[in-house]
From Swiss-Prot:
GO terms for biological process: asexual sporulation; sporulation resulting in formation of a cellular spore. It is found in: Spore core. The lineage of its organism: Bacteria, Bacillati, Bacillota, Bacilli, Bacillales. Its main location: other. Belongs to the SspI family. NCBIfam families: SASP_sspI. This is Small, acid-soluble spore protein I. Induction: Expressed only in the forespore compartment of sporulating cells. It comes from Shouchella clausii (strain KSM-K16) (Alkalihalobacillus clausii). It holds the Pfam family SSPI. Keywords: Sporulation.
Length: 69
């Protein structure tokens, strides 16, 4: 028996409103708990799959800027 964490997270967050997604992200960031990282990764993956090239470029630039401050 194998457990697919990505699918479990998607099943848990599917159908979430914009406000619920934001609350999930804020909660994960404020709690600082490492157990929240896979969920943030799945949310990032969803964003990436739906973003156009300019959105991806902008996001990567912002992340890079934040990593180099």
């Amino acid at each position: 028996m194998s457990f697919n964490l990505r699918n479990a997270i998607m099943a848990n967050i599917q159908g979430s409103s914009q406000q619920e997604v934001e609350a999930t992200i804020v909660d994960a960031m404020e709690s600082g708990e490492e157990k929240m990282l896979p969920g943030l990764g799945v949310l990032f993956e969803v964003y990436w799959k739906h973003a156009d090239e300019s959105q991806k470029d902008e996001l990567c630039a912002e992340i890079s800027k934040g990593l180099n401050e």
